[in-house]
Design a protein with these regions (language model features):
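Glycine-rich phosphate-binding loop used to anchor ATP phosphates in small-molecule kinases
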Residues: 1-16
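Short gly/Ser/Thr-rich phosphate-binding loop of adenylate-forming enzymes
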Residues: 12-15, 86, 92
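Conserved phosphate-donor/acceptor-positioning beta-strand/loop module used by diverse small-molecule
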Residues: 15-40, 98
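PAPS-dependent sulfotransferases, especially Golgi type II membrane carbohydrate sulfotransferases
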Residues: 35-81, 88-151
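Generic beta-strand/beta-sheet core signal
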Residues: 3-5, 25-28, 82
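Residue-identity detector for glycine
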Residues: 13, 21-22, 76, 139
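Conserved nucleotide-binding/hydrolysis micro-motifs of P-loop NTPases
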Residues: 8, 29-34, 87-89
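Hydrophobic/aromatic-lined pockets within catalytic cores
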Residues: 10, 20, 103
Length: 151
């Protein structure tokens, strides 16, 4: 099961309790890039009212980092950390590592995930999930750094 919702970090304790053999794949990304991505997507959920102002996003990001650090200390073997930037810039190697960590069999189609049009994606990145890996989101916030601050 893969779920990349912004608030999944809140459920790590429950996941560990009910799925003790599962692994949390934690993708870490530059703080300003991730905060800007949240800001520009304009989430209209009452559960994500923190996502409309840069200062609220930054505060929420700080909470997320504190919680992730706590859970990594409590159950580090339950986590696999991957750098977003490494995943983008060294995709084949990083994807092979992910497949290995999940005890799955390698298949070259893993590098062509975007060709699978039967996968249901219900997030703001549904279009991106159907595209090859690209790097234009790395440093994207730099275009707006004079107008918006996230750290």
């Amino acid at each position: 099961i893969t779920d990349k919702a912004n608030e999944n970090f809140k459920w790590i304790g429950i996941i560990k309790l009910f799925l003790p053999n599962s692994i949390i794949l934690h993708c870490e990304r530059d703080q300003s890039d991730i905060c800007f991505s949240i800001f520009k997507n304009n989430f209209n959920s009452k559960n994500m009212n923190w996502s409309s102002k840069p200062e609220h996003i930054t505060r929420y990001y700080d909470l997320y980092k504190k919680m992730m650090n706590f859970w990594k200390k409590e159950c580090g073997d339950f986590f696999y950390n991957i750098s977003y930037e490494n995943l983008i810039n060294n995709s084949e190697n990083e994807i092979k590592n992910l497949i290995k960590i999940c005890n799955l069999k390698w298949d070259d189609r893993c590098l062509r995930f975007y060709e699978n049009n039967t996968t249901y994606v219900r997030t703001t990145s549904a279009v991106q999930a159907r595209m090859p890996i690209y790097s234009k989101s790395i440093g994207n916030y730099l275009n707006f750094k004079d107008f918006i601050k996230f750290n």
